[in-house]
């Protein structure tokens, strides 16, 4: 029997994208730092609110005692960020594949939206008015400024942590850089 995991699905999609010649951009250091800030840090294995083993910056363990983690536990901060960078692959793939070739984003804009995708999930990203607006050719600064702050609820309730996260993502989105991210070559 094949065991399905979100990470396996993300890797399968990434593999298919790469096989087609698509180069998925990686989130930059500012992206990793932003996600790390809001995911929180735990160097030792702990149980998340639904009882799943978790470690580092919210890495959901796939095997007992996080046996798949290639770093010694307790994690160092450096190894925790390396693990987070690997975990971000699904959100990076999602953001790259959800946007059309007409969408031009610099590395900070892309990173802000990768953080959002990491938090809300790819299904929500793909069906969002934010992505529809970007793909329609709406001004990126306008559509993101209007739509991103609306993603501040959990269970129908405005959560202060999500309000802060969206504000930080928007600040990163508006931070200029000469480094490009999208459109990605071959995607």
Model-identified regions with their sequence ranges:
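Extracytoplasmic
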Residues: 30, 50-52, 108-110
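Catalytic glycan-binding domains that act on GlcNAc-containing polysaccharides
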Residues: 42-49, 104, 121
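Alpha-helical segment that forms one wall of the substrate-binding/catalytic cleft
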Residues: 69-101, 107, 111-125, 140
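Substrate-binding/active-site groove segments that recognize
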Residues: 47-70
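Structural recognition of the beta-strand scaffold that forms the well-ordered cores
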Residues: 34, 54-56, 112-117, 143-147
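Long, amphipathic alpha-helical surface segments
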Residues: 18-44, 78-81, 85-86, 123-187
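Fungal secretory targeting signals
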Residues: 1-21
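Secretory/exported precursors with cleavable N-terminal leaders
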Residues: 37-40, 57-60, 120
